[in-house]
Every structure is written in structure tokens, then in C-alpha cells.
């Protein structure tokens, strides 16, 4: 589908932007995708999924090229081991990404949903309906499969997106985008320019200056990376700067369960932002729990750091410093602190947590409820691994990122987090003057049942 990309007015900073043509194309595409029928968007998603599988060999070969170059960067100290781990894309990860695309396909269309239908008066009907945000800029590090998740969510929500992956995953991102574009070309109704790949840091800098043309920036990566993005743009930013998660083992915890949850929350994928960095243990259960947990964690290769009370029980732990409590390791390193009460655990989380995901292990229902109610985080869990904090596991199909801000969206941002709403008012020549003054006509304000929008 060809598009008209004229823009009648531009922000002053955008006039000379090297990205201007690309962003104008994206905005034109967004106007089209905003009103695409669900059937067309779902056909585009299925075409994407099919093309990704058909291009698997080329995608994995490109990823292998990235991995070989990244291995040299790790040796030279230019890339962390955790970043290298996130970069790897094998057949199973690709299959999981494709499954995520198809799950998004099966989810209800979030666009055109009626959140409110209210008859203000006879013939004067107010509706609040969902609508795409417009043009997204998504910048991510290391994980090339994130590109697939983001593209799927953008297609389903009718948004355009400009994607920039880390330089260490350039070949992988190019191969993935080539496959996705090949799939979308099979759907003639789907506009060109809605999904675009950026490949340089200069383009990112230019993107961050396009206030008024780009509606939302979503960074995914290290805390320093996310902070850089937040500090260098006036475009709204959705994301989290840290993933500093805690698991608290209460005095009433099932010890075996607590050990299993500790292992899963830390070692299942230590580079993930929802892996725990600090283990808090109640003093009453510490003598029984810590020896078992330490043994199990060491068998998984975890480096352990403990506070003084912890080292009284396990003397050979590395002493934990003040910096450890505020460090996101994203690696097989875990700090352990013994606390005297639930209050102390909550206070520690309040001071050092990043409002991402926090969990308690306990059989005490009252303690669990206090933790769930009082801990301020996007996700608060009871007797469950912090690793469940994920859009796919929540049934959102995929996530574009995790937001730790107080205002919505919060937590894993899926389809609902990528739409806004607008008020639509239909009347029959109604005048405000008729509803003011001594003889003012009264409003009826009758709510109707919600209905779905585009089909």
C-alpha cells in the first residue's frame, strides 16, 4: 500500500533530522493501521510467524555471526557475559518468539474497544474508545528476539514502530526484520513503513529529538542505558531503569519450597530483569533454610554474598557491602540478608527495591497479605517465582517492556499498554446554551452496555 507522507507542520528540531523521511513514512502508515480491520492485522501476524520459520536458517546463521563477534568483545572486556547470554538466539528461542506472535494473533483486538458509552441526553451520546498511540520508538539491548515481540504488538495495536537493537545483535536484527517484512509483503492491505529498523547510534540520537513526531520511546536494557534515554529526550518514555528484585523467606515458609523458589528466581535466567538480586531471610528460619539454599545455589555456580548475621550461619560467604543491596547483577551473583521481622524485610525492599517484582515465601496467610498490600512494586507475588513477571506468562502474548512507574501502564506492557483512548461525542445539533441558565435542560447521563469496536 502506498502512502502520502506530507506533514503540514514540523517541530523546529525535526526539520533537518536525517530520520525525517522515515518518521513521516511511519506516521502515514500509522494513520492507516489505526483503522485496519482485525482480520487484516491477524493475517499480517500469521504471515510474520510463517516467514520467521521459513527464514530460520538465515536468522540463526546471522545470530551465530553476532555471537562470534560478541565472544571476542567479552574476551576484551567490552561486553558483559550477561549481555552475551541475552544475545543468543537458538531454534527454541525462535520457536518461542513465533509462538508469542501467534498468541498475540489470538488475543482480542485492543483497538476500537468501548470503555464507556453514556447518553448525556436524548440523541447526545458520548463514547470513550481505545485508539493506537501512533509512532513508537523502541530501543533495546542484546536480545534480538525482543524485536519479534515488539513487532507483533505494534501490528496488533495498529502502531508504527522504529526499532533499534544493540550493535552486538545487528546481523540478527537485520535477518529478523527481513523475514518479517517478507511476511508483511504478502498482505497487500498492510502499509509499508509501519515497521522500520534503525542501525546506528546517530539514528537513535536523531530519534530522541523528534518530539511531536514520535509519540512514545520505550527503552529496554541496562539501568545506565535506560537513564541515558530518559535524560536525553522530551518524548514520553515508558520503561524501567533497574530490575532489582527480592525474594523474602518468611519465618513460616515451607523450607523445601523456599529453596526451589530461590533457585528458580535466581538461576533459571539470571540475566533477566525479573531475576532476584537479594534474598531476605527471617532470622527464625535462617538456621534451617540457609545451609540448604547455599548448597543448592553453589551447585548452580552462584557467587554468594552475605551480611554479618548471614555469615554467622555460613561463615565462608563473601561479605556483602552497602553497594550490594542496590546492585542489579544480571549474573550468577546473589546477596543474602537475615532480617528480624516482616517489617524489616518490607523496609529493606522499600529502600533498595526498584519497584519491579518482589516475592514472599510463607504459609502465613496474614503475613502474605501484608506483603502483597504494603510492598510497592509492579508485581508482588506469594509463593511464586519472580520469573513469572513476563507478558507471555501473564497471557498478554508478548511484552514491549516492563514499566515500574506508578501511572499506567504498569508491569509487563502488552497490547493494552500500547493504546490510548479518545472521547467521541455524537449529537443532533445539541447546544451547550440549552443546558445553562435558569431554564437549563437537565442531563440524563444514562450509561449503556459496553460494546466492541472494529471487526
UniProtKB/Swiss-Prot annotation:
Q: Which GO terms describe its molecular function?
A: glutamate-5-semialdehyde dehydrogenase activity; NADP binding
Q: What class of enzyme is it?
A: oxidoreductase
- Name a Pfam family for this protein: Aldedh
* Annotated EC: 1.2.1.41
Query: SUPFAM superfamilies in the record, alphabetically?
Result: ALDH-like
Keyword list, A-Z? Amino-acid biosynthesis, Cytoplasm, NADP, Oxidoreductase, Proline biosynthesis
Catalyzed reactions: L-glutamate 5-semialdehyde + phosphate + NADP(+) = L-glutamyl 5-phosphate + NADPH + H(+)
An example GO CC term for this entry is: cytoplasm
Recorded superkingdom: Bacteria
Among CDD domains, the record links this protein to: ALDH_F18-19_ProA-GPR (cd07079)
User: Which pathway does the UniProt entry assign to this protein?
Assistant: Amino-acid biosynthesis; L-proline biosynthesis; L-glutamate 5-semialdehyde from L-glutamate: step 2/2
GO annotations under biological process? L-proline biosynthetic process
| UniProt-annotated location(s) | Cytoplasm
**Stored NCBIfam families:** PRK00197.1 (NF001221), proA (TIGR00407)
* Family, as annotated: Belongs to the gamma-glutamyl phosphate reductase family.
Q: Give the function comment from the record.
A: Catalyzes the NADPH-dependent reduction of L-glutamate 5-phosphate into L-glutamate 5-semialdehyde and phosphate. The product spontaneously undergoes cyclization to form 1-pyrroline-5-carboxylate.
What name does the UniProt record give this protein? Gamma-glutamyl phosphate reductase
Origin species: Synechococcus sp. (strain JA-3-3Ab) (Cyanobacteria bacterium Yellowstone A-Prime)
Q: Which gene encodes it?
A: proA
